[in-house]
Amino acid sequence: MLEVASARDRDWAGALVRDNMAEAYRRHGLAWDPARFAADWAGGENYLLRCDGGAVGYLRLLRHAGRSYLQDLQVVAERRGLGLGTQALEQAKALVRGRGEAALRLKVFADSPAVRLYRRHGFVELLNEPPLIGMECRLP
């Protein structure tokens, strides 16, 4: 279940994103930028994914120009493959739909295994900006 993250959760969430994205960043010649993460945190809607009383993931939504973007969706390594990312994604879509918005957008590395997850949940490719692709899910 998603719950609003507090300021004290920022370091934990940042470490999760940094660790989960380390291989992709290395592959694409990028460096982790803690200042960028802090700025994104400050400008976004931050949620923890909780299961069995503990934090097992992190999700951030960003609203820009009247649209909502899924900026981060991370699950701790030992809890992947259990449907937690799917649950978080469906809850994020419900949040955005509840605001009356018609779509949720995101960017993801084109070579990320997450692309399959997003496609299974109705996201289609809108643009290709290597190494990223932009995707959108229309919300009924």
Spell out what each predicted region is.
Residues 119-129:
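Conserved acetyl-CoA-binding loop of GNAT-fold acetyltransferases
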Residues 8, 14-41:
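Conserved GNAT-fold acetyl-CoA-binding loop/helix
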Residues 75, 81-94, 116-120:
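Conserved acetyl-CoA-binding loop-helix of GNAT-fold acetyltransferases
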Residues 38-48, 55, 69:
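A short helix-loop-beta-strand connector motif used in the catalytic cores of GNAT acetyltransferases and
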Residues 54-62, 67-74:
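Conserved beta-strand in the GNAT
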Residues 45-48, 58, 72, 105, ...:
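Short hydrophobic/aromatic beta-strand element in the GNAT-like acyltransferase core
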